[in-house]
């Protein structure tokens, strides 16, 4: 009888465990993307300015345009002044009633003194939303000791993918804390969700972004500030090699619009429903299945990248 009760208890626990995870998966997919209406971002932000890094291309540029469309003044930060000037012009052509400022900064520069100068400029305005988007990618997947560009490239990826989100958050948070309102969105990557061979540094730095965001959320839980980590999969951007758009690979405008709608409804999410479906499926797969798929994808990616760099046709 005791054995029978034990077996029944174990069986019930297993069923409850499976049911819990099934419900969690369904909620992760449907709540932010189907059930909930977008929140009033201006009310939650508590201020009219949005700062976006890496704002002249891809996801960052689309975040800038979408925030401007929603009535925020935008402060765009990137490396190239000519691209910043053009982006400012393009935003104002579509949204002439807002204000756009820009600051040039090369985020491979880890100088604290230079960061303080940048933060001094940013703190001239009341920042309600900070989008830490700037990031860097290797040319192609490779083993750590064979990475193209050596330790210089490795250092740059680590610096760009970790320092800006950390230091800019630290520098902007004081004004958010004093207002008891604000939103900080850190853009990570699908690569931070699982351990990726031959993308070790990129994957690890994106995991840092996700982990940092979660820690800050706990740290400032009583200050009225929203912290969100976005972990997108493939988006049709220059950084991703400009792939064709599809259900699973949206353009950056579609992605940014979707991701902004999840603020206040999901603390950690991919930002796009198709990516969330991919993410939930991926988490269910055993490592050997993921590793085999990644290995095949890496080989194809590397072959294409090397062929392009050498300007030779693929075999």
UniProtKB/Swiss-Prot annotation:
In terms of SUPFAM superfamilies, this protein maps to:
NAD(P)-binding Rossmann-fold domains
Q: Which gene encodes it?
A: stdh-2
A GO CC annotation given for this chain: endoplasmic reticulum
Instruction: Tell me the Pfam families matching this sequence.
Output: adh_short (PF00106)
Q: Which InterPro entries match?
A: NAD(P)-bd_dom_sf, Sc_DH/Rdtase_CS, SDR_fam
Catalytic residue list: 202
Q: In its UniProt entry, what is this protein called? A: Putative steroid dehydrogenase 2
Quick one: a GO biological-process term for this protein? steroid biosynthetic process
Residues where NADP(+) binds: 47-76
């Amino acid at each position: 009888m005791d054995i029978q009760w034990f077996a029944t208890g174990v069986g019930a626990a297993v069923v409850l465990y499976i049911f819990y995870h099934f419900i969690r998966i369904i909620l992760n997919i449907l709540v932010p993307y189907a059930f909930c209406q977008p929140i009033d971002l201006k009310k939650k932000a508590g201020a009219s300015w949005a700062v976006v890094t890496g704002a002249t291309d891809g996801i960052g540029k689309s975040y800038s345009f979408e925030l401007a469309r929603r009535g925020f003044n935008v402060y765009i930060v990137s490396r190239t002044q000519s691209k910043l000037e053009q982006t400012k012009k393009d935003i104002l052509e579509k949204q002439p009633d807002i204000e756009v400022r820009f600051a040039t900064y090369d985020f491979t520069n880890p100088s604290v003194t230079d960061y303080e100068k940048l933060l001094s400029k940013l703190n001239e305005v009341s920042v309600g939303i900070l989008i830490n988007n700037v990031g860097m990618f290797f040319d192609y997947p490779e083993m750590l000791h064979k990475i193209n560009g050596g330790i210089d490239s490795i250092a740059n990826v680590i610096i760009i993918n970790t320092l800006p989100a950390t230091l800019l958050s630290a520098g902007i948070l004081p004004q958010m804390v004093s207002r008891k309102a604000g939103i900080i969105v850190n853009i990570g990557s699908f690569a931070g969700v699982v351990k990726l061979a031959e993308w070790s540094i990129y994957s690890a730095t994106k995991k840092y972004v996700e982990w940092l965001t979660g820690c800050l959320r706990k740290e400032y839980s009583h200050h009225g500030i929203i912290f969100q980590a976005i972990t997108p999969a493939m988006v049709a951007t220059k950084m991703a090699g400009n792939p064709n758009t599809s259900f699973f690979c949206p353009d950056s405008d579609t992605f940014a619009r979707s991701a902004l709608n999840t603020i206040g409804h999901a603390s950690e999410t991919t930002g796009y429903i198709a990516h969330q479906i991919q993410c939930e499926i991926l988490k269910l797969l055993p490592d050997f299945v993921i590793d085999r798929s990644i290995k095949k994808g890496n080989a194809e990616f590397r072959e294409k990248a090397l062929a392009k760099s050498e300007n030779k046709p693929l075999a």
